[in-house]
Each structure stands twice: as C-alpha cells, then as structure tokens.
Amino acid sequence: MPCACNRSNWRRWIRPLLVLFYATTILVAVPICIWKFQKMKVGMHTKSWFIAGIFLLLTIPVSLWGILQHLVHYTQPELQKPIIRILWMVPIYSVDSWVALVYPKIAIYVDTWRECYEAYVIYNFMIFLTNYLTIRFPNLILHLEAKDQQNHILPLCCCPPWAMGEMLLFRCKLGVLQYTVVRPITTVTALVCEILDVYDEGNFGFSNAWTYLVILNNLSQLFAMYCLLLFYKVLKEELSPIQPVGKFLCVKLVVFVSFWQAVLIALLVKLGVISEKRTWEWQSAEAVATGLQDFIICIEMFFAAIAHHYTFSYKPYVHEAEEGSCFDSFLAMWDVSDIRDDISEQVRRVGRTMRGYPKKKCFPGDPDHNEHSSLLSSSSQDLTSGSSKVPSPGGLYQGFGHTISSQSPISIASIYEEIMNDIPEEQQKLLNPGQDVTINIPEEQQKLIDKRKDVMIDIPEQNAIPDNSQYQDQEQIVTLQALFPSTETSENSMIDTSESQQESSDLCTESSDSSTESSDLSTDP
C-alpha cells in the first residue's frame, strides 16, 4: 500500500490537517498561559510576555499558511525554495523572541541564533534574484557585458567601478555570501564571550566584546545590503516582472529595523534613560533592554507576516504541473546543501586567487557541473545549449530549488590558455605553437593547397603575406591536436578549416577564370 504522503490527493488533506493541528495547539497553549499568568505575580514582565504571546498566536498561522501554500503549489522549485526560507524568518523571529522574553536568562543564547538567520535570509533573497534572471537569461554574463557600465552608488561612489559581466556578478554574490559566514562566526564568538563573562550585551564600551562584535556585524551587514542594492540597480528592468522592490523592502526592513532598534535601545541604556533605578522584574538595565527588544519584535512580526503573505504570494505559481509527493516537498524545504556548495566553491576560488592561479572554467561535458552548481560558480556552457532546463518537482528532493548557474561561451583561446597553464614550462617549450607539428592532411585538401600556391603569383604582396596574428587560433588548435590526438576536432577548428577550404576554392576559381581569359586572348586573331 503506497504511503499517503505520495498519493496525488495529498494537497486536499494537508491544509485541513494544519488547521486542526493549530487549533489543538491553541486549545492546549492558551489555558496553560492563563494558568501561569494567574499563578505568577502580575508585573511588567508578566504582562509583556502575555501580550507578546497574543501577537505570536496571530503571527504563526499567517506565516505557516503562506509556507504551506507554496509547498502545495511547488511548481517552480528554483524560485519557491528561497521564498519558503524567507517566509520562515517571521515565525522563527516570533518564537525566538517570545521564548527569550519569558526566560530572560537564556535570552543571549536564543537571540544570537535568531540573528544568524538574518544572514541566511539575505543570502536566499540573492538566490531568488539570480535564479529568476538565469531562467530568463540563460547567458546572464553576456547580458551583463552588453549593458552600460554601472558606477558605484553612495557611499562607495568614489571607488573604481566593477567591470560589467562576470566580475560584477561574482562580487555582488560574494558581498552577500560573506555575511552568511561572518554572522555565524560572530555568534559563536558572542557565546564564548558570554561564558567568559566579557560580552556585556547592551553596554557600549571598549572593555567588552559586544561593542566590537556589533561594529563588525554592522559593517558586514551594510556591505551585503549594498551589494544587493547595486545588483538591483544594474538589473532593474530585467527584474521588474517579479516586482522586486516590495520583496527587497520586506527583507531589508525586517533585518535593519531589528538591528538598529537594538542599537537604539543600547544607546538609551548608555544615556541613562533605561537605568538600574527601575528594572521591574528584570535583573539589570541591560536585561530590560533585551526584553524590550524581544517584546517589540513579537509585535513587529505580526505586521511582517501580513506583508510577506502578499509580497511573496504563492498565486503566481498556481498552475498545472507534474505532481510531486508531500515527502519530497517537505524535504526540499529543509535541504541546505546549496549553502555548503557555495561556501566550498568560494573557499576554492579565493584559494586559487591567493596562489595566483587563473579562474578555472568547466567544459560543457564536465560531470561536476549539474543542477547542484553553487551560487558563486559561473559555469561555461555551449551557447547552443539553449535555455536552462528546470527540474521537475516530481523528482528527488535533492534537485529541488538549487541555484542555477548562468552560461558563458567557450573560445579556443581560453581552452588553450587553461591547458598551457597546467603544463610545466619544460614541456611547454616542446609544445610551442611555433614549432612544426605533423598533421595528416587529406589528399583533396593537399591538392587545393598546391593549387593555391600556383595562384599566389597573381596576389598582391600585402595580401599574399597576411599578419601572423590572424592565424593565432589555428596555431592553438594545432597545439590542442598535438595534446589530444584522439579527441575529435572542435567546432571552431571545423569552422576554420571550412573557411580555408572556401578561400582556396575561391582562389582556384579565380585562377580558372584567369586561365580562360588568357586562352581567349591567345586565340583571338
């Protein structure tokens, strides 16, 4: 008997099941909260977490309903997977803030992990934009190179601009990804400093770790948002069909408002507005500041959930498609292998840059290049391959919603350069393109070449001795044939050979015409 999750009608019962589960949770949680509220001494702290709990109960169903609708209509995994991750931001923030508000002693631990999710959200928003552009423009790098040069915007307007094309795309991705690395590192550092009693959250001063970590996080976050903004400015017209402004504001406001209001509350503590004179049921003024931050976030997330519901709506993805199983959809939602691939690729690329190695490009038949390509990889595929193929939602969950890599063309010169860079200098001398290399030329082509030599006397000197640079690619093809004698001739070399044959044929035709004309003149009395 097949699993119920794999039946085609799972979309019918999953939504009523969620409603039933949430109703049961309400019936159990509300009486417990009321009983605890009456048992405890009713003070400012108790009232704050009770009011925040009401907003939490209103926020969770709005967010979960939007997530569930995307899973039910999971027809475009490359776009919907990052959207689902962004939608999870609201319930994670709400639950985390409420738990920290109820139990202030563990606030430092839950709040730091909550802030880590900020970087994850910004990263997924970048994935969403790049995947959409790659689906619409399979050769995104070439499309960027054709656009006018974009200068930096404030506050980096004085810096040299990034070259349009691969450099701009890579650096914008790198700017976003660096925050996903910096933020977890600072989070672990904050936990260690708290254990060592040198963190001192909410207190501005050069004697604690909190001040330095806040400055580092702020700089990293600002640069990530700057790269997102620059990326949007360059591709504003191309992104207009998905209305990115509202989506960008939803992500930016949640991240920036939560961060800067924490800084503002810390300044109130520093200025003495929040002081030890009145801490209500909290242990210190810093604990009051943390509790105030968590309380405000619980209220803000209710409005953020409503904004996310309309901004990241599931309705554009409601259409007939191959049905996937419930199990695959839920596993795809939690799959984070693309992050591992992106970070690994970035580490390799930075390592190659530091060692002075050139960028490595993938051949069209490279088995390592598939739908699991990382965010930072710019794969080199044949221009004739057409548009990127979107994986079906009915397949295995590992293929759901991974980042799509843009295509870029391959030239003989680039292949030649990559191969020669990997060959020792001693062997390069033996394989110098200037040396004579024996090539088996068909008899018919040899006849054409011999005829061409006979006609050379009628060609002007400047045309008879062309510039050697015109045949640079042919010399490189000769070297590649010497390196890979068993490999079939590339498409470019076939084109060059065809052009040579055509040129020889034209010259022979001219020679024949000249001979005929001479014959006519000789027979004319």
Swiss-Prot record:
Polar residues compositional bias, start-end: 483-502
GO annotations of cellular component type: membrane
Region Disordered, annotated ranges: 358-394, 483-525
Entries under Pfam families matching the protein: Solute_trans_a (PF03619)
Localization per Swiss-Prot or TrEMBL: Membrane
SS bond partners: none
Keywords on record: Membrane, Transmembrane, Transmembrane helix
Mode of membrane association: Multi-pass membrane protein
Keyword Cell wall biogenesis/degradation attached: no
UniProt main location, coarse: membrane
Keyword Transmembrane (UniProt): yes
Biased composition range(s): Low complexity: 373-388, 503-525
Entry's transmembrane regions: 17-37, 48-68, 83-103, 121-141, 212-232, 254-274, 287-307
Entry superkingdom: Eukaryota
Function, in words: Possible tumor suppressor which may play a role in cell growth.
Family: Belongs to the TMEM184 family.
Protein's UniProt name: Transmembrane protein 184C
Organism (species): Mus musculus
Gene behind this protein: Tmem184c
